[in-house]
A protein has these predicted regions:
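Extracytoplasmic/periplasmic, Sec-exported soluble proteins
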Residues: 99-107, 138, 189-194, 198, ...
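N-terminal accessory interaction module
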Residues: 1-2, 10
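A domain-level signal for caspase-like cysteine endopeptidase catalytic cores
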Residues: 66, 70-175
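Active-site-proximal C-terminal subdomain of hydrolase catalytic domains
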Residues: 210-297
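Cysteine protease catalytic core and zymogen-processing segment of caspase-like enzymes
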Residues: 155-237
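Secretory targeting signatures
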Residues: 9-12, 16-17, 23-70, 146, ...
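Short amphipathic alpha-helical segments and helix-helix/interface helices
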Residues: 112, 135-136, 198-202, 225-226, ...
């Protein structure tokens, strides 16, 4: 392909992804202003589908070869995370994506001690290790409890932030299919995981795992927790809106302690919320999905 054609292709990709991201929920705008941009996103997607249909009708064309190479999505075969020695047994994962911007060594230490007292080993996933590739194989590690101390989206569609820097040229297929998004964190754009990533990209099944989502707004609607449940999780606990880091740390430390003493989800949630209440700044409440479950780890 000559330089001019490659440049036109780069410009097309740039414009398409910019429009697609603009059409998604902007966490700085109220929901009422999103309808027009959603329509733009649908129109752009239809145009993209027509373009790809034309390109793939001619498999020998240079454009077809480039599209095939560039649009490869995330799946088990493309992940660089080894699953051959996946940990089994009584295990807990603490995914501390927030740790680089909002470190809380006291929280990490207390949760680790509580886990050990209850007979569990805890795998600490450092801020730089919360990558897309890590999340791809997360179900296959057979954790009993997964703690997601990550950034999220307070307004609009829920999402879980990763440690991977966003690029419109990476994992394009997953972006086009709305399985990956982006969020600004401390001046840097990061990839985020949308519900479709959990449903269609993650490998394997969770073994009735309890998911603790310390992130903002994961239970604003049932879409994200349903994706986890459909992937084999037993229950999801998270916030129904924006939450401050200090409050989520306090509440979840209490919640985790209750779970590790053998209390079920309902009882643990009741104890933690009665002790700390909603976020005093934002009013966000801690909820579980399903709404009522006595399951325990």
């Amino acid at each position: 392909m000559n330089a001019d054609r490659k440049e036109r292709w780069d410009i097309w990709i740039e414009e398409y992804l910019a429009n697609a991201l603009a059409a998604r929920s902007d966490n700085k705008r109220p929901r009422g202003k999103l309808a027009g941009k959603r329509k733009l996103g649908v129109s752009t997607l239809l145009l993209a589908l027509l373009t790809f249909t034309f390109i793939f009708a001619f498999p020998s064309s240079p454009a077809h070869k480039i599209v095939t190479a560039v649009l490869g999505g995330s799946d088990c075969s493309t992940s660089t995370t080894s699953i051959s020695n996946a940990p089994l047994g009584m295990r807990i994962a603490l995914v501390d994506q927030l740790g680089s911007q909002y470190p809380n060594p006291g929280f990490v230490e207390n949760v680790t001690l509580s886990a050990r007292k209850a007979g569990y080993s805890l795998d600490y996933i450092s801020p730089n290790s919360a990558s897309i590739d890590f999340f791809i194989n997360l179900p296959t590690y057979h954790y009993n409890l997964i703690i997601l101390r990550t950034h999220g989206v307070a307004v609009g569609s829920a999402a879980i932030a990763t440690s991977d820097t966003y690029s419109q040229y990476n994992r394009i297929n997953d972006q086009l299919l709305d399985r990956l998004g982006a969020i600004e964190s401390n001046g840097t754009l990061l990839f985020t995981l949308n519900p479709g990533f959990v449903s269609y990209v993650m490998c394997g099944k969770f073994p009735n795992t309890i998911i603790l989502a310390m992130t903002c707004g994961l239970l604003t609607s049932s879409t994200y927790p349903q994706a986890f449940i459909g992937k084999g999780a037993g229950a999801v606990i998270g916030w129904n809106g924006a939450v401050t880091v200090s409050h989520t740390d306090l509440v979840f430390e209490s919640l985790i302690t209750e779970l590790l003493t053998g209390n079920g989800v309902d009882r643990s949630l009741q104890v933690a919320t009665e002790r700390w209440g909603p976020d005093p700044l934002t009013g966000a409440q801690l909820l579980s999905y399903p709404n009522s479950t006595s399951m325990s780890i």
